[in-house]
């Protein structure tokens, strides 16, 4: 019985390790399936079970230029980048991409500085907005696409002003582009 309990506890961990051996893009592809024609997103478990179906957002958190893509090694650390970096200009407003509730606001994540925000969108989907110069939301606050949650900055482990935009499914980083339509080009 003890061996069965250990196997049940370790099964999700082993699934994550197996998928992660294919890299962060492999994990992202396993959890999020996108229909490029309809912009419909299927969010799944590592075992392939459907969690929910969504429509991709057109509300990028900031207009700007992508300076680093998801999964690309991040110098000087040489680990895969867990989000997308967007440079829209220091002090520009940062908005939430999808309806949700603020889970964390402040310094809760190593390297993000004092003005990070994490939003719980339900279905195990969270988004993180890091390196901001200020945040203006409180834990438990409801937010919707377009609501300003902070300002672009260079807080924490940042080489310059930008927004680090990360989406996680059940705690695993996935490619934010899977949830977005188009590009965050400056208007």
Question: Where do the protein language model's features map onto the residues?
Answer:
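Extracytoplasmic/periplasmic beta-strand context in beta-sandwich domains
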Residues: 64, 82-84, 115-117, 147, ...
């Amino acid at each position: 019985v003890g061996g069965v309990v250990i196997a049940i506890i370790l099964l999700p961990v082993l699934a994550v390790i197996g998928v992660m051996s294919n890299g962060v893009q492999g994990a992202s592809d396993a959890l999020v399936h996108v229909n490029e024609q309809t912009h419909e997103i299927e969010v799944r478990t590592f075992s392939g079970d459907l969690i929910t179906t969504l429509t991709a957002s057109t509300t990028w958190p900031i207009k700007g230029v992508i300076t680093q893509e998801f999964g690309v090694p991040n110098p000087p650390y040489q680990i895969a980048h867990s989000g997308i970096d967007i440079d829209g200009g220091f002090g520009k407003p940062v908005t939430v991409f999808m309806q949700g509730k603020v889970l964390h606001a402040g310094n809760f994540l190593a390297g993000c500085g004092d003005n990070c925000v994490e939003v719980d969108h339900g279905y195990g989907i969270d988004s993180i907005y890091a390196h901001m110069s200020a945040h203006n939301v409180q834990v438990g606050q409801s937010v919707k696409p377009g609501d300003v949650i902070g300002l672009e900055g260079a807080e924490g482990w940042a080489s310059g002003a930008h927004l680090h935009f990360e989406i996680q499914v059940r705690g695993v980083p996935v490619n934010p582009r899977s949830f977005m339509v188009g590009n965050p080009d400056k208007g």
